[in-house]
């Protein structure tokens, strides 16, 4: 199994919207990727919660059956359609993939 964890810090304003609006839109778009390929075991997109400590605005925690499933997800057109929007609104990104 491969775990794929990504955290994004968003710009204060981008694409004509504020950080909170863009975070909600990004979550909506990423949620559409939750079942686009076989082998996605877990797919959680979460926004930072005001009452809990967070240095990033949005996190994706996902588990894939194997490397092939992760690669299929990354290459899938639905995922690729989200990439330009995320690139336009993000200030920073951290990612870690690891096998368990």
Q: Whereabouts are the PLM-identified features?
A:
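Short S/T/G/P-rich N-terminal loop/turn motif that feeds into the first structured element of a domain
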Residues: 1-56, 65-71, 99-100
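C-terminal structural segments of small proteins and small subunits
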Residues: 64-89, 93
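A generic hydrophobic-segment detector
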Residues: 92-100
């Amino acid at each position: 199994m491969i775990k794929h964890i990504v955290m994004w810090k968003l710009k204060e304003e981008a694409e004509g919207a504020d950080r909170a609006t863009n975070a909600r839109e990004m979550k909506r778009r990423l949620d559409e990727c939750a079942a686009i390929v076989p082998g996605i075991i877990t797919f959680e997109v979460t926004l930072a919660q005001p009452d809990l400590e967070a240095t990033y605005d949005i996190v994706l925690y996902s588990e894939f059956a194997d490397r092939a499933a992760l690669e299929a997800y990354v290459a899938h057109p639905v995922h690729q359609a989200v990439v330009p929007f995320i690139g336009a609104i993000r200030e920073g990104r951290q990612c870690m993939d690891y096998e368990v």
